[in-house]
């Protein structure tokens, strides 16, 4: 079923059709219209504005954002899902920039190899979004899903996305009859972010385990697993054996580290040592993820952590969490189930 949904969606996408892409109910729980940027037309942009009603954005890779000199919209991103907005833009030759034609013109420029940063003015009416390297395997958002679709379809990694709102202005949620009726009415295929995660996991991997050894960690004997990701960064999992070990649903604690394995200055210091006591007593996994941000002392890319758990053969797990942690969402595509959250 998943393979069929993905292959049919990719075929439609590479033929210039829009898709409805939905994320998990425990995340944004939204349906977005998604269109490959190279197939943008004024008519399709008008359709998004008229029928989807949300904010029209353009997802693209970090390389393209750098090429067009599109810096982040803010220096510290503290939005709920850390959506990576850049400064907004218009095509330089646009008048107001808001018409469907002029928004299409801006999108068209983002898709051309010859476009220069000076071809845009800032701010504007198109909102670029930078997709995480690694796509949905690094961050389970519509931004990454739309760029992944372009890459899987062999298209330039620029995608137009727009949230779908109901006629009363409320968001169209996954499971709403509105979205299924919308898809039927406009003859649109539907795809889930979890479908893309499953599809990519079947065909590629961002993570490889290259070392497994017994190692003492803070005066406790553990099994240490070392992983290398697609950016040549190391991530580590320490398995603790406790008196009350639950192999079917082990305890898991995620914690950020810096390149030099510095884990004591990356935030959640008190919670870290509380988690350590749980792990020593009950067993489980302490996973160090090399995704630390100097601006926000939190683990930002849960996708890597999910891949570590998947590589370790974990399916169900119990999360050791603290108020400094953000929620871990969109797990279904990784074959994981969070069965309990233990507050620290």
Swiss-Prot record:
Pfam families: DHBP_synthase, GTP_cyclohydro2. One of its GO terms (cellular component) is cytosol. Mg(2+) 1 binds at residue 28. It is an enzyme of class 4 (lyase). Disulfide bonds: none annotated. It comes from the Bacteria. The keyword Calcium does not apply. Its EC number is 4.1.99.12. This is 3,4-dihydroxy-2-butanone 4-phosphate synthase. It comes from Helicobacter pylori (strain J99 / ATCC 700824) (Campylobacter pylori J99).
């Amino acid at each position: 079923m998943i393979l069929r949904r993905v292959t049919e969606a990719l075929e439609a996408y590479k033929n210039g059709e829009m898709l409805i892409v939905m994320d998990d109910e425990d995340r944004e729980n939204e349906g977005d219209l998604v269109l490959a940027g190279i197939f943008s037309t004024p008519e399709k942009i008008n359709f998004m504005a008229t029928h989807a009603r949300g904010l029209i954005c353009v997802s693209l890779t970090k390389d393209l954002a750098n090429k067009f000199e599109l810096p982040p919209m803010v220096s510290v991103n503290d939005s709920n899902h850390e959506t990576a907005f850049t400064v907004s833009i218009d095509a330089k030759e646009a008048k107001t920039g808001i018409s469907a034609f002029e928004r299409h013109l801006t999108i068209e420029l983002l898709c051309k190899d010859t476009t220069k940063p000076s071809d845009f003015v800032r701010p504007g009416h198109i909102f670029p979004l930078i997709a995480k390297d690694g796509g949905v395997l690094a961050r389970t958002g519509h931004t990454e899903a739309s760029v992944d679709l372009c890459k899987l379809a062999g298209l330039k990694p620029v995608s137009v996305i727009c949230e779908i709102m109901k006629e009363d202005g409320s968001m169209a949620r996954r499971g709403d009859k509105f979205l299924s009726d919308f898809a039927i009415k406009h003859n649109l295929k539907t795809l889930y972010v979890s479908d893309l995660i499953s599809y990519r996991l079947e065909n590629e991997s961002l993570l490889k385990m290259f070392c497994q050894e017994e190692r003492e960690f803070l005066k406790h004997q553990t099994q240490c697993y070392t992983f290398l990701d697609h950016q040549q960064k190391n991530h580590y999992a320490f398995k603790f054996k406790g008196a009350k070990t639950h192999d079917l649903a082990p305890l898991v604690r995620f914690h950020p580290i810096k390149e030099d394995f510095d884990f004591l200055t990356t935030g959640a210091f008190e919670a870290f040592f509380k988690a350590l006591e749980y792990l020593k007593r009950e067993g489980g996994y302490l996973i160090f993820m090399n995704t630390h941000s100097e601006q926000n002392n939190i683990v930002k890319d849960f996708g890597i952590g999910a891949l570590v758990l998947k590589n370790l053969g974990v399916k169900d797990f119990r999360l050791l969490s603290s108020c400094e942690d953000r929620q871990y969402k969109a797990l279904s595509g990784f074959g994981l189930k969070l069965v309990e959250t233990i507050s620290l």
